[in-house]
Swiss-Prot record:
<feature type="compositionally biased region" description="Basic residues">
    <location>
        <begin position="28"/>
        <end position="38"/>
    </location>
</feature>
<keyword id="KW-0272">Extracellular matrix</keyword>
<feature type="repeat" description="LRR 3">
    <location>
        <begin position="135"/>
        <end position="158"/>
    </location>
</feature>
<keyword id="KW-1015">Disulfide bond</keyword>
<dbReference type="GO" id="GO:0008201">
    <property type="term" value="F:heparin binding"/>
</dbReference>
<feature type="glycosylation site" description="N-linked (GlcNAc...) asparagine">
    <location>
        <position position="316"/>
    </location>
</feature>
<dbReference type="GO" id="GO:0090398">
    <property type="term" value="P:cellular senescence"/>
</dbReference>
<dbReference type="InterPro" id="IPR003591">
    <property type="entry name" value="Leu-rich_rpt_typical-subtyp"/>
</dbReference>
<comment type="function">
    <text>May anchor basement membranes to the underlying connective tissue.</text>
</comment>
<keyword id="KW-0654">Proteoglycan</keyword>
<dbReference type="InterPro" id="IPR000372">
    <property type="entry name" value="LRRNT"/>
</dbReference>
<feature type="repeat" description="LRR 1">
    <location>
        <begin position="91"/>
        <end position="110"/>
    </location>
</feature>
<protein>
    <recommendedName>
        <fullName>Prolargin</fullName>
    </recommendedName>
</protein>
<feature type="repeat" description="LRR 11">
    <location>
        <begin position="320"/>
        <end position="358"/>
    </location>
</feature>
<feature type="glycosylation site" description="N-linked (GlcNAc...) asparagine">
    <location>
        <position position="285"/>
    </location>
</feature>
<feature type="repeat" description="LRR 5">
    <location>
        <begin position="180"/>
        <end position="203"/>
    </location>
</feature>
<feature type="compositionally biased region" description="Pro residues">
    <location>
        <begin position="39"/>
        <end position="62"/>
    </location>
</feature>
Amino acid sequence: MRASFFWLLPLLLILASVAQGQPTRPKPGIRRKPKPRPTPRFPQAPEPAEPTDLPPPLPPGPPSVFPDCPRECYCPPDFPSALYCDSRNLRRVPVIPPRIHYLYLQNNFITELPLESFQNATGLRWVNLDNNRIRKVDQRVLGKLPSLAFLYMEKNQLEEVPSALPRNLEQLRLSQNLISRIPPGVFSKLENLLLLDLQHNRLSDGVFKADTFQGLKNLMQLNLAHNILRKMPPKVPQAIHQLYLDSNKIETIPNGYFKDFPNLAFIRMNYNKLSDRGLPKNSFNISNLLVLHLSHNKISNVPAISNKLEHLYLNNNSIEKINGTQICPNNLVAFHDFSSDLENVPHLRYLRLDGNFLKPPIPLDLMMCFRLLQSVVI
């Protein structure tokens, strides 16, 4: 009997292992419920809309202490005449309260200025519309701002200078637009304008007529740099102090062009095509000229300068030699007498000549003439 038990024990172990490998059958009439699928923790994002380069407007800010303050702007409590609507992704000019004198609307997406843009704010003195997308300006909208003195419309898409500008305008900044037209008489009533900035546009020689600048009796700064001019603009206002003509294609300066500018102290004509042939003698020998920029041209000889010139930039030209005796405004022999009147010594303090075909040392006659020189780059 003990022997039969030893034979029975392996058989029971085999049957137990087979039973463990088979799945258990469910009881009749009972169905197993499928395991629930895990639900997403957050709802699925909607399908993306069509791509656009215009971000949505910013949500309204907190209520202001001023009931008339636009919700999309900021009205500083300590500066009640100012309204800050800059960098708000605005598509249009909000309703401006009448108390506002200083309006900041730069860095938005405004595309036009319709007639009703500043309907209630006729006391505006300062308007900044830089870096928008303005293409169209109603011909009457700016004329309704009689107190406007500073208008900034840089980095927009204007194709012409806006019309009917306010008479009291002092600064007009229109750089980095697409301006290729200046309407006739647009500046004729701007006697108070001191600064006109038209750099980085598409202005050509045909745009400037003999009467284009007529009326700008007190203009002090004119910036026409980075345009496509080949000639000097005609009839520039005589009161001008600073003239910027960098990065054009000007080859020639008419004889005596600068003689009618008694206050002209600053000239920039870098990156043009000026050569000795296009520079008449004494072109820049102007009594009150203090700073002269002529770098990156094709000049071979140092032009004649006046006693009062303090800074001269001639780098990156075609100059091969420099003669202090020839370019000295006064008689160099007189400077050997140290008891001579030092008031007549040339005022030149900074001279830049690098990027030419010159090599050190600096000529002695150059140093004898320009005794006040503090820096020479060669």
